[in-house]
Every structure is written in structure tokens, then in C-alpha cells.
């Protein structure tokens, strides 16, 4: 049997079981725990490669062939770190494992048959993960969307109305009209987009109107006054409509200290921004919120972990 060196194998098919990959410019190292391929039966598209009629491409007329296959991808998800082919059918993942031609290759899954209608996407040397969710977006410009997609982000949650002072500061799309216009503008983009309404009000109708207009929740921001009253009202309406609330707490402590904010939250679930304190809020006391079971703490650009 002809053999190639490990270096040549990685160059052709990407890393395999036991290989370690550094993640970007971080100090994090990912080790591949399992490779679903059958060595010697790998599929690959291109000149002199295997995705050809009768080879890795099935000629059987009755098989349920894939619409697309991502070949030899390194996958990182909640189940582990592994190497596999990813089959796509009708716009959804049909299977993960060994893809190819069941008539000529060993180990090919029933739902991973490559046929004449299958598009090939090269995954060699690339990492595949679930789409990232960015939960803190100031919607200033449409150019943010392609930049996020290039980074693997497929869901963006935040607020704003474009390059306005309120947008730069608060991640809020305030009011029924602004929310509807942002949703209308979002229709043309291949990105999952969600918009926060303005939670800084004690006006129950104003809160409800924003949810009915399409807001996925409320943002309470200190620039509009993160007082105990508006925290309580926004959480009341959020519970009624089963939506979320995010908060940027009060840096100046003019509406109360961190203890007053936690009392207004009252054990209800809330997403606290800048919980490390570097980006604002009850700095540095807001870090106390990270110890509360009902609070989802978050950090943003002022604190970037896993880098030098």
C-alpha cells in the first residue's frame, strides 16, 4: 500500500485524529478527538481527486443524494472536536460523518451519499462551528453585516436606527415606527437580526407597543436612566410577553447603587452588559451580578479574553 507522510496528509485532507490546531492568535489549542473518514477512502473535489462518476460520486439512480457536501472539515461544537464530512439537503444539515459512494466506499452513511446533483465545498484546513450569536450590536451601518458573516456570526442582536447619537450609545431601536423600519430594512440581508426596544419607560403601553411592533425584548440603558422603576416595568412586560431584557447599569449611581438594581430585578432573568465593569455600569461593583443565578453576565470589547 502506498503511504504518504502526515505532513502531506494534512496538506491534502486537513488535520486528523490527534492533530492539534491553534485557534487564531489565541493561546487556545484544539485537538481532534476523532476522524470519521476511512483512510484511503477520503473524498475530495478537484483535478485528479475522487469526486467523480463511479468513484466517490454514486451512479445509483435511487439514492437520496445530497445537495451539497462539505468535505474533510474540522468541527467544533458542544459534542466535541472531530473531523468529518457534512452533508446538506434541502438547506439543512442531513448528516455528519463519512460521505461518498456507498457502492464503492466503506463507511459511507445512508444520508451522506454524494451524487451527480451534489455541490462540493472544500472544508480541508477549515474549522466549522455553529453560527456565532453576537448579543450586543449597535446597528450603525449595514456594512457591519458582511463583516460579521466573514467572522462566522449568523445572528446579531442589538438596537439602533443607523448613525444616530442614540445608536452609538445605547443599542436601542426606540418606539414602534423605528422598530418596524429596522425590520423592513433587515429583510434583504442573509443574517438573523433581532432588535431591542426601549425599556427606559414606566409607560406600559409604550413597552407593549414595541413588542407588538416586532422587538425581541427591551434594552435598559443608563444614558436614558437605568432607574429601579424602569427596570421593574420592563421586566414585568417582558414576563408577560415572554421576551428578554438587557441592561447597562448606572455608572453614576444616580438612580441607585448595585444593591438597588438587584432589588429591582427581583430574581427575574436579565442579561447584564459590561458585567466586568470596564464598559460602564456600577463599575466595579456590577461584577457582583455575576454571582446571581438569575443573571446572564456579559462582557464586550473593553475586556477581550484569551488574547495576549
UniProtKB/Swiss-Prot annotation:
Example GO molecular function: urease activity
Binding site for Ni(2+) 1: 219, 248, 274
N6-carboxylysine found at: 219
InterPro entries to which the protein is assigned, alphabetical: Amidohydro-rel (IPR006680), Metal-dep_hydrolase_composite (IPR011059), Metal_Hydrolase (IPR032466), Urease_alpha_N_dom (IPR011612), Urease_alpha_subunit (IPR050112), Urease_asu_c (IPR017951), Urease_Ni-bd (IPR029754)
Cystines in this chain: none
Protein keywords: Cytoplasm, Hydrolase, Metal-binding, Nickel
Tree of life domain: Bacteria
Gene Ontology BP term (one): urea catabolic process
Domain Urease: 131-308
Description of how the protein assembles with itself and partners: Heterohexamer of 3 UreA (alpha) and 3 UreB (beta) subunits.
Annotated protein name in UniProt: Urease subunit beta
Amino acid at each position: 500500500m502506498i503511504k504518504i507522510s502526515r505532513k502531506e496528509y494534512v496538506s491534502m485532507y486537513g488535520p486528523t485524529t490527534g492533530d492539534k490546531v491553534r485557534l487564531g492568535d489565541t493561546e487556545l489549542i484544539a485537538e481532534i478527538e476523532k476522524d470519521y473518514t476511512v483512510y484511503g477512502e477520503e473524498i475530495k473535489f478537484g483535478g485528479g481527486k475522487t469526486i467523480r462518476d463511479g468513484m466517490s460520486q454514486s451512479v445509483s439512480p435511487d439514492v437520496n443524494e445530497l445537495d451539497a457536501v462539505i468535505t474533510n472539515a474540522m468541527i467544533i461544537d458542544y459534542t466535541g472536536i472531530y473531523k468529518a464530512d457534512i452533508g446538506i439537503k434541502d438547506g439543512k444539515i442531513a448528516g455528519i460523518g463519512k460521505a461518498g459512494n456507498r457502492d464503492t466506499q466503506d463507511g459511507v452513511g445512508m444520508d451522506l451519499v454524494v451524487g451527480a446533483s451534489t455541490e462540493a465545498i472544500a472544508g480541508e484546513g477549515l474549522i466549522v462551528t455553529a453560527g456565532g450569536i453576537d448579543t450586543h450590536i449597535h446597528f450603525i451601518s449595514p456594512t457591519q453585516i458582511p463583516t460579521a458573516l466573514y467572522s462566522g456570526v449568523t445572528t446579531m442582536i442589538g438596537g439602533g436606527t443607523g448613525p444616530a447619537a442614540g445608536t452609538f450609545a445605547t443599542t436601542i431601536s426606540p418606539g414602534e415606527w423605528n422598530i418596524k423600519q429596522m425590520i423592513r430594512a433587515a429583510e434583504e440581508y442573509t443574517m438573523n437580526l433581532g432588535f431591542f426596544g426601549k425599556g427606559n419607560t414606566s409607560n406600559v403601553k409604550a413597552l407593549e407597543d414595541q413588542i407588538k411592533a416586532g422587538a425581541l425584548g427591551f434594552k435598559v440603558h443608563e444614558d436614558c436612566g437605568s432607574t429601579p422603576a424602569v427596570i421593574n416595568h420592563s421586566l414585568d412586560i417582558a414576563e408577560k410577553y415572554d421576551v428578554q431584557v438587557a441592561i447597562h447599569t448606572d455608572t453614576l449611581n444616580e438612580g441607585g447603587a448595585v444593591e438597588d438594581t438587584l432589588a429591582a430585578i427581583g430574581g427575574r432573568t436579565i442579561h447584564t452588559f459590561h458585567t466586568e465593569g470596564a464598559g460602564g455600569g456600577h463599575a466595579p461593583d456590577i461584577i457582583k451580578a455575576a454571582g446571581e443565578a438569575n443573571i446572564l453576565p456579559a462582557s464586550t470589547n473593553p475586556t477581550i479574553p484569551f488574547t495576549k
